[in-house]
From Swiss-Prot:
The probable endonuclease active site in the N-terminus and the basic amino acid cluster in the C-terminus are important for the shutoff activity. The C-terminus acts as a nuclear localization signal. The C-terminus is recruited to host protein complexes involved in nuclear Pol II RNA processing. Pfam families: Flu_PA. InterPro entries: PA/PA-X, PA/PA-X_sf. The active site is at residues 80, 108. Belongs to the influenza viruses PA-X family. This is Protein PA-X. It comes from Influenza A virus (strain A/Turkey/Minnesota/501/1978 H6N8). The lineage of its organism: Viruses, Riboviria, Orthornavirae, Negarnaviricota, Polyploviricotina. Keywords: Decay of host mRNAs by virus, Eukaryotic host gene expression shutoff by virus, Host cytoplasm, Host gene expression shutoff by virus, Host mRNA suppression by virus, Host nucleus, Host-virus interaction. It is found in: Host cytoplasm; Host nucleus.
């Protein structure tokens, strides 16, 4: 699973996921299913935001990579992926500027057009069950919830899906592709079932035990099949800016 994640997702996504797990004392090499889940969630958050801007009239528009957008404002503020201190700093700034109610839990995005925080969910289960779990945890009508599944289903607060059909279809297609590729490699069952995941972890750890006197060889090649999974959705200019913003070392 770890190799699949590193080859499947954008390097920035992988780096952010590793950073988030280490912040909570978790090891991506051991908790590989969680590693995959975090990367998937991060990618959906970025895909949700990418190419969506607000023009000078305050209208939401879609601008593909390469088009001039210097005078446009990004519609969504990405909160997910930041360390907790920086995330709350961003939230406090948004609340002070817009006057919106401060959430009790860290949301994933802020929508400058609708003036609301958004909680994104990606589930391997039934969307309505996961939606209710999110709603019961957040206990706030101010935070908008949008749930996606790997089967193409989705559910959102008051059936308000925020994005246009094409943008949501892009996310659903990506999730379905991840599921299919996991399944073709025998990874999907362990990703869905905790019991199967534990069995797979024991198997992986046993396979990782080095034989006495045997040299360890690591391959950095990407298989042709996995090359088709490499995400092409990120705006290169914004990727560089986000990397600098999200991954910079805190000042001592």
């Amino acid at each position: 699973m770890e190799d699949f994640v590193r080859q499947c997702f954008n390097p920035m996504i992988v780096e952010l996921a590793e950073k988030a797990m280490k912040e909570y004392g978790e090891d991506p090499k051991i908790e590989t299913n969680k590693f995959a889940a975090i990367c998937t969630h991060l990618e959906v958050c970025f895909m949700y935001s990418d190419f969506h801007f607000i023009d000078e009239r305050g209208e939401s528009i879609i601008v593909e990579s390469g088009d001039p957008n210097a005078l446009l404002k990004h519609r969504f503020e990405i909160i997910e992926g930041r360390d907790r201190t920086m995330a709350w700093t961003v939230i406090n700034s948004i609340c002070n500027t817009t006057g919106v109610e401060k959430p009790k839990f860290l949301p994933d995005l802020y929508d400058y057009k609708e003036n609301r925080f958004i909680e994104i969910g990606v589930t391997r289960r039934e969307v309505h069950i996961y939606y209710l779990e999110k709603a019961n945890k957040i206990k706030s009508e101010k935070t908008h919830i949008h749930i996606f599944s790997f089967t193409g289903e989705e559910m959102a607060t008051k059936a308000d899906y925020t994005l246009d059909d094409e943008s949501r279809a892009r996310i659903k297609t990506r999730l379905f592709t991840i599921r299919q590729e996991m399944a073709s490699r025998g990874l999907w069952d362990s990703f869905v079932s905790p019991r199967e995941a534990k069995r797979q972890l024991k198997k992986d750890l046993k396979l990782q035990e080095p034989c006495a006197g045997s040299p360890t060889k690591v391959s950095h090649r990407t298989s042709p099949a996995l090359k088709t999974l490499e995400p092409m959705w990120m705006d290169s200019n914004r990727t560089a800016a986000l990397r600098a913003s999200f991954l910079k070392c805190p000042k001592k």
